[in-house]
Curated annotation (Swiss-Prot):
It comes from Histophilus somni (strain 2336) (Haemophilus somnus). This is UPF0756 membrane protein HSM_1471. Its main location: membrane. InterPro entries: UPF0756_TM. The keyword Chaperone does not apply. GO terms for cellular component: plasma membrane. It is found in: Cell membrane. The chain crosses the membrane at residues 1-21, 52-72, 81-101, 123-143. Keywords: Cell membrane, Membrane, Transmembrane, Transmembrane helix. It is a multi-pass membrane protein.
């Protein structure tokens, strides 16, 4: 096995370091796995991850979000809570964020080079502004509003 020292490997190492410095385990783990895949016999599975990775990630994320409801840690609201203005606002924000995510998927598919900037910006926001890494899909969706392209 020979290691490949190329710009992609350098980018992944940089993302690993930024993830560690920014205390962003999602970036650190993701970049580490991709670096290991790139540098080993697992490289043949990178096209699979490229094609299905976002969908797999969304499925895992959805399972994570629904698990507290299924386990009983989060109770379903009663009918009176469903008609409260805060619930309507929460639903509206949920719809808006889902729309951002959809725009983000389209933008990342048509302009994947922007992903690096989104990841670095997310890491900087986590590291220096006390932010939470909510995900590049939403960031890409918001970016698409500024640059005006989704596909």
């Amino acid at each position: 096995m020979s290691l490949q020292f190329n710009s992609i490997a350098l980018l992944l190492v940089s993302l690993i370091l930024l993830g560690v410095l920014g205390n962003n385990s999602s970036i650190t783990i993701s970049a580490t796995i991709l670096l290991l895949m790139q540098q080993t016999f697992l490289a043949k599975y990178i096209p699979f991850m490229e094609r299905y990775g976002v969908n797999i990630g969304i499925i895992v994320l959805t399972i994570g979000v629904l698990s507290p409801i299924v386990s009983g840690k989060v109770q379903l609201p009663n009918w009176t809570a469903l008609i409260h203005w805060k619930m309507f606002l929460a639903m509206a924000v949920g719809v808006l964020v889902a729309w951002f995510g959809g725009r983000g998927v389209n933008l990342m598919g048509t302009q994947p080079s922007l992903l690096t900037g989104l990841l670095v910006g997310t890491i900087l926001g986590v590291a220096f502004l006390g932010g939470v890494p909510v995900g590049p899909l939403i960031a890409a969706g918001i970016l698409s509003l500024f640059i005006g392209k989704t596909g």
